[in-house]
C-alpha cells in the first residue's frame, strides 16, 4: 500500500541537520466514491521542521504524518530524534505522494499534516500513534494556486482549547494533479469485477482491513479525532455509498474516454494509411459510437472540448474558482504566472491621473472597484467639503475612533490585499456601488471561501496562505540585496496600496533610492523575511556582527503596525543580539500617532515630517499638481536616513483579544497583538451586527452606532491565536474604515495602576509592589488607551495612559473616587496615567466590541486585555531619530 521508512536519525544533535531523502507514496482505490468525486494525486515536498516548544515531557522522537481529512489511511515519515529540550530545527527531504478523492460539491478537501509519536503503555511501546500537533491545508486552494515557491504551515498543539503554535513545517512544493482513469483501473486489478456490488458495510470493512496494517486497531488512535474537522460518521458513510446504476454510467464514460484516448492522430494516419483505404468511413463509425454512448448516458459536464485533455477533466463538473480575476491555471502553473493578472500590476502613479479625474473627488480609475467594497467606506460625495486632518474637523467630532483616516476616495488599489475578484461587467460594477443585503452577499460568495475565511477557521495563517507576494517585490529586493557578504545601509519599504505611497514610490524611484513597493500583507511578509534571512546569511559568513540596517517604513500607522508584528514574530525566535541588527525610520503618510510623538521629542523630525507642507502634500491629492512648489521630498527623506543615528527605544505593549465563539460548541479564541501606539474602542449591538465573515457594511457616515460596522478587507481582520512569542503577521495594509459616530457605549473597564518611582522607594522594603485596582462601569462616549510615553519621560516604569469621555447617568454618577460632577455638565473627559494592565468588556454580554489597534480594526471581540509590556524578550521597537531635543516655542 505504501512505502514507509522507519529510520531513526542519529541521536547526536549535530546530525539533525542532515536530511534523509525519502519518497513516500500510496495508491488507493477511490473509484468507490460518489460521482461528484474526482481522484487526484497530491504531491507534497517538505524541506524543514521547526519545533518551538516542548510537545511532551520526555519526548524522544516524532514522526511526520500526512493524511486527507476523513480518510483513515496515513502516510508517516521516519522517526525524527528530538534533543532533550524538545525544540529542534532540522532540514527535511521528504516527498509524499498520495491519491485522494477530491469532492466537488462539498467542503473538506483538506490535507492534514501532523506531528505524532508512538503510543506507550507503562514505558512500553504499543500499536498506534498519538497526535501532538496538527495543521491543515485546503486542497481546493492548492488547485487554484499551486505552491511552487514554498510556504510555511503552522502546527497547533490543540484545537479544542485555545490553539497554540507549537511547530512549523516548511513546504517546498505542493500540488494536486489529475490521475488518468486507465492507470487507476489497471491498478485496481481484480477488484474491478466486484465494484458494482460494493455496499456500505463492505466499504467500511475494506477500509479497516487496510488500516490494520497502519494503526493496528481500528479507531484506537482517538487523539487524531480531535484534529479532524470532518463530517459526522453517518454523513461520511453516505458520501461513499453509490448505486450500481451510477457505476455503470461511470464505466461507460470511461470506455468513451478510453476510445478517444487511443484514437490515432491524423499525422500517423497520413504517414501509414494505404491510398485505397477509406479512413473517413471508419472515423464516422467511431464518431457515431461516441454520440450513441453519450446520448444513452449523458455526462453532466457537457461535450468534450479537446481530445488531449485529461480524462478526469471532462466528465466531472468544474470547481468554481475562488478568485475570478485570476486565470484558471492548472496544477503545474508557476506562481510567476499569477503576477500577470490585472490586480497584481503595479498601481499607476497619481501623477498619471488626468486632471478631470482628480477634480471628481480625487478618484483614480480603480476606485470604483476598490474603495466601496474592500473597505466599506463611502465615496467623497458622502463627506462633502470636509477638509482632511483639519483642527476644526477633529475638534468638532467626538467619534468612537477620534483619528480621521484618509478620505475614502483616495484609498486605491485595495483589491490587491487579498487575491481579488476583477469582474468588470457593468451589472456587477453597478451593484458594487450600493450596499447589498447579507443574503445576496452570502449567495454570491463562494462557499469554500466562506468556510476558509479567517473568522471561520480561527487558524493562525489561514488568510496569509491565500496571498502570494508579487514578483516585483522579489525583483526589487534582489536589486538591493546584492550579496551575502555585504548588507545595504538602508531599505525603504513603501505601502503602495494607497495613493500616497504610489506617489512617494514614483518620486523615490526616479532618484534610484532602494525602494521596495508593497501593497499586500504577503508583500510585506516576503520583504521582511527576505531581509532577515539576508542578515542571517551575513552572520553565518562573518564573525563580526553586522552594522544595523536602517529600514524606512513609509505609510500610515497601520502599515507600521504590520512591520511591528513581523519584527516581534521574527525576532522572538532569535537571540537578543538580533535586537541591534535593525533600526526603523518612520516616514508618515496620513494619520500617524507615532510620528506625532516622535515630533514631540525631536524637533528636527518635527520640522521634516510634521509641518503643514508635508501634511498637505500627503493628505490632499490636489496638492500633487503643484509638486514643484512643495518641499523637496527626496531631500527630506535622504537627510533623515543619513542623519538619524540615535535609536529611540519605543516600548511594545501587548493586546490580548478574546473573540466570540462561532457556534455554541466552540470555545472562544484568543489572539495576542503587539502595539506601540493607540488602542481605540467601539461597540456593536447584536440586533444589527452581521456575522464576522460578512462583508455587508453600512457607510461610516451613517452616524448611528447601532448600524452595521464598516468592515475592512478580510486581510485587515488580522492577528492569529498565537502566544506572545509568535504573533500573527497577516495584518492588512489598507486603512481600516472610519468608526461610526460618537455614540454611547456601556462598558466596564478594570485597570491596575502601577506604583510611581517615588512610591517604590518608599515601599522598597515591601516584597510586593503596591498595585491599585480601579473599575469604571458607566456609559462612555469614547475610550482610548495609549502606550506612547509622555513627552520628556525618561526610563520610567512600563505604563499606559487612558483617555475617557463619560456621560452622566441622572447627572449624579460618580466618576472615580471623586465628588459628583456638576449638574450642568453632561460629559467629562479625563486622562488616567500609570496604568499597567487594563481589561475592557461590554456591560451587556451580547454586545461585541470593535477594537482599533494601531490603525488596524478587529471585530467580534468579547473583551480584551492590555498589558504595558510585551511578554517576550522583544520589548522595544528601535526607531531612529536625530536626537532627543524638543522644539523651542
Curated annotation (Swiss-Prot):
MF annotations from Gene Ontology: transmembrane transporter binding
InterPro entries assigned to the protein according to its UniProt record, in alphabetical order: Phosphofurin_acidic_CS-1
Biased composition annotated in UniProt, kind: Low complexity: 687-720, 727-737
UniProt biased composition (Basic and acidic residues): 343-358
Compartment(s): Endoplasmic reticulum; Mitochondrion
Modified residues (Phosphoserine): 390, 416, 453, 691, 694
A biological process term (GO) from this entry: mitochondrion-endoplasmic reticulum membrane tethering
Broad class of the protein's primary localization: endoplasmic reticulum
Region (Disordered) residue spans: 180-246, 293-463, 687-740
Coiled-coil parts of chain: none
Cellular component GO terms held in the UniProt record: endoplasmic reticulum; mitochondrion
Keywords noted in UniProt: Apoptosis, Disease variant, Endoplasmic reticulum, Epilepsy, Host-virus interaction, Mitochondrion, Phosphoprotein
Keyword Mitochondrion: yes
Chain's role: Multifunctional sorting protein that controls the endoplasmic reticulum (ER)-mitochondria communication, including the apposition of mitochondria with the ER and ER homeostasis. In addition, in response to apoptotic inducer, translocates BIB to mitochondria, which initiates a sequence of events including the formation of mitochondrial truncated BID, the release of cytochrome c, the activation of caspase-3 thereby causing cell death. May also be involved in ion channel trafficking, directing acidic cluster-containing ion channels to distinct subcellular compartments.
Quaternary assembly: Interacts with BID and PKD2. Interacts with SIRT1. Interacts with HDAC1. Interacts with TRPV1. Interacts with WDR37.
Protein name (record): Phosphofurin acidic cluster sorting protein 2
Amino acid at each position: 500500500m505504501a512505502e514507509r521508512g522507519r529510520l531513526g536519525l542519529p541521536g547526536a544533535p549535530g546530525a539533525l541537520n542532515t536530511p534523509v531523502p525519502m519518497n513516500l507514496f500510496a495508491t488507493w482505490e477511490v473509484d468507490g466514491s460518489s460521482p461528484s468525486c474526482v481522484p487526484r494525486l497530491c504531491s507534497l515536498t517538505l524541506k524543514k521542521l521547526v519545533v518551538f516548544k516542548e510537545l511532551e515531557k520526555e519526548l524522544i522522537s516524532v514522526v511526520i504524518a500526512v493524511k486527507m481529512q476523513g480518510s483513515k489511511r496515513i502516510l508517516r515519515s521516519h522517526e525524527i530524534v528530538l534533543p532533550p529540550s524538545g525544540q529542534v530545527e532540522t532540514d527535511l527531504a521528504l516527498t509524499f505522494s498520495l491519491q485522494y478523492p477530491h469532492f466537488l460539491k462539498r467542503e473538506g478537501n483538506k490535507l492534514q499534516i501532523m506531528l505524532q509519536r508512538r503510543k506507550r503503555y507503562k514505558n512500553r511501546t504499543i500499536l498506534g500513534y498519538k497526535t501532538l500537533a496538527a495543521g491543515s491545508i485546503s486542497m481546493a486552494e492548492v488547485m487554484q494556486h499551486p505552491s511552487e515557491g514554498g510556504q510555511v504551515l503552522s502546527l497547533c498543539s490543540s484545537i479544542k482549547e485555545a490553539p497554540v503554535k507549537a511547530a512549523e513545517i516548511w513546504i517546498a512544493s505542493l500540488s494536486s494533479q489529475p490521475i488518468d482513469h486507465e492507470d487507476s483501473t489497471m491498478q485496481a486489478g481484480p477488484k474491478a469485477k466486484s465494484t458494482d456490488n460494493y455496499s456500505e458495510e463492505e466499504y467500511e470493512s475494506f477500509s479497516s482491513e487496510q488500516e490494520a496494517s497502519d494503526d493496528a486497531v481500528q479507531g484506537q488512535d482517538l487523539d487524531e479525532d480531535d484534529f479532524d474537522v470532518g463530517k459526522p460518521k453517518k454523513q461520511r458513510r453516505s458520501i461513499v455509498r453509490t448505486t450500481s446504476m451510477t457505476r455503470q454510467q461511470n464505466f461507460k464514460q470511461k470506455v468513451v474516454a478510453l476510445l478517444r484516448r487511443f484514437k490515432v492522430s491524423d499525422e500517423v494516419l497520413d504517414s501509414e494509411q494505404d491510398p485505397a483505404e477509406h479512413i473517413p468511413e471508419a472515423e464516422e463509425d467511431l464518431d457515431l459510437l461516441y454520440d450513441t454512448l453519450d446520448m444513452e448516458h449523458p455526462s453532466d459536464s457537457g461535450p468534450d472540448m479537446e481530445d488531449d485533455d485529461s480524462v478526469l477533466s471532462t466528465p466531472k463538473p468544474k470547481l468554481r474558482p475562488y478568485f475570478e480575476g485570476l486565470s484558471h491555471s492548472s496544477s503545474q502553473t508557476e506562481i510567476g504566472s499569477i503576477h500577470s493578472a490585472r490586480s497584481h500590476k503595479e498601481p499607476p502613479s497619481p501623477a498619471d491621473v488626468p486632471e478631470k479625474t482628480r477634480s471628481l473627488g480625487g478618484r483614480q480609475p480603480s476606485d470604483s472597484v476598490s474603495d466601496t467594497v474592500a473597505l466599506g467606506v463611502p465615496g467623497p460625495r458622502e463627506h462633502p467639503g470636509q477638509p482632511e486632518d483639519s483642527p476644526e474637523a477633529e475638534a468638532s467630532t467626538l467619534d468612537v475612533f477620534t483619528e480621521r483616516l484618509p478620505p475614502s476616495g483616495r484609498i486605491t488599489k485595495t483589491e490587491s490585499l487579498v487575491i481579488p475578484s476583477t469582474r468588470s461587467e457593468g451589472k456587477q460594477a453597478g451593484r458594487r456601488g450600493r450596499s447589498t443585503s447579507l443574503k445576496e452577499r452570502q449567495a454570491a460568495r463562494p462557499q469554500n471561501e466562506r468556510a476558509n475565511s479567517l473568522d471561520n477557521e480561527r487558524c493562525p495563517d489561514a488568510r496569509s496562505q491565500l496571498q502570494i507576494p508579487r514578483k516585483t517585490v522579489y525583483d526589487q529586493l534582489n536589486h538591493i540585496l546584492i550579496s551575502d557578504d555585504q548588507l545595504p545601509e538602508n531599505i525603504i519599504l513603501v505601502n503602495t496600496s494607497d495613493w500616497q505611497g504610489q506617489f512617494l514610490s514614483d518620486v523615490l524611484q526616479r532618484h534610484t533610492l532602494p525602494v521596495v513597493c508593497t501593497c499586500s500583507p504577503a508583500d510585506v511578509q516576503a520583504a521582511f523575511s527576505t531581509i532577515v534571512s539576508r542578515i542571517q546569511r551575513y552572520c553565518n559568513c562573518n564573525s563580526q556582527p553586522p552594522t544595523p540596517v536602517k529600514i524606512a517604513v513609509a505609510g500610515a500607522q497601520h502599515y507600521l503596525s504590520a512591520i511591528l508584528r513581523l519584527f516581534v514574530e521574527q525576532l522572538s525566535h532569535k537571540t537578543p543580539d538580533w535586537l541591534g541588527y535593525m533600526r526603523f525610520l518612520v516616514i508618515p503618510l496620513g494619520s500617524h500617532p507615532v510620528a506625532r510623538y516622535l515630533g514631540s521629542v525631536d524637533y528636527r523630525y518635527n520640522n521634516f515630517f510634521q509641518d503643514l507642507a508635508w501634511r498637505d502634500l500627503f493628505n490632499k491629492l490636489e496638492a500633487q499638481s503643484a509638486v514643484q512648489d512643495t518641499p523637496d521630498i527626496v531631500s527630506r527623506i535622504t537627510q533623515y536616513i543619513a542623519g538619524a543615528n540615535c535609536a529611540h527605544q519605543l516600548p511594545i505593549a501587548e493586546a490580548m483579544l478574546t473573540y466570540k465563539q462561532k457556534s455554541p460548541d466552540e470555545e472562544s479564541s484568543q489572539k495576542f497583538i503587539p502595539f506601540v501606539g493607540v488602542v481605540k474602542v467601539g461597540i456593536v449591538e447584536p440586533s444589527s451586527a452581521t456575522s464576522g465573515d460578512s462583508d455587508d457594511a453600512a457607510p461610516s457616515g451613517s452616524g448611528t452606532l447601532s448600524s452595521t460596522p464598516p468592515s475592512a478587507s478580510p486581510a485587515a481582520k488580522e492577528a492569529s491565536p498565537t502566544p506572545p512569542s509568535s504573533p500573527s503577521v497577516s495584518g492588512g495594509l489598507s486603512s481600516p474604515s472610519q468608526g461610526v459616530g460618537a455614540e454611547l457605549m456601556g462598558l466596564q473597564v478594570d485597570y491596575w495602576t502601577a506604583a510611581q518611582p517615588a512610591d517604590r522607594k518608599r515601599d522598597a522594603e515591601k516584597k510586593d509592589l503596591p498595585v491599585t485596582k480601579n473599575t469604571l462601569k458607566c456609559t462612555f462616549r469614547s475610550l482610548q488607551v495609549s502606550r506612547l510615553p509622555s513627552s520628556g519621560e525618561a526610563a520610567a516604569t512600563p505604563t499606559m495612559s487612558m483617555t475617557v469621555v463619560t456621560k452622566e447617568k441622572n447627572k449624579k454618577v460618580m466618576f472615580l473616587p471623586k465628588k459628583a460632577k456638576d449638574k450642568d455638565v453632561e460629559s467629562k473627559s479625563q486622562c488616567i496615567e500609570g496604568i499597567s494592565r487594563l481589561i475592557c468588556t461590554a456591560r451587556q454580554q451580547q454586545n461585541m466590541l470593535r477594537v482599533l489597534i494601531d490603525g488596524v480594526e478587529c471585530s467580534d471581540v468579547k473583551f480584551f486585555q492590555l498589558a504595558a509590556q510585551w511578554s517576550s524578550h522583544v520589548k522595544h521597537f528601535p526607531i531612529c531619530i536625530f536626537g532627543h531635543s524638543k522644539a523651542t516655542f
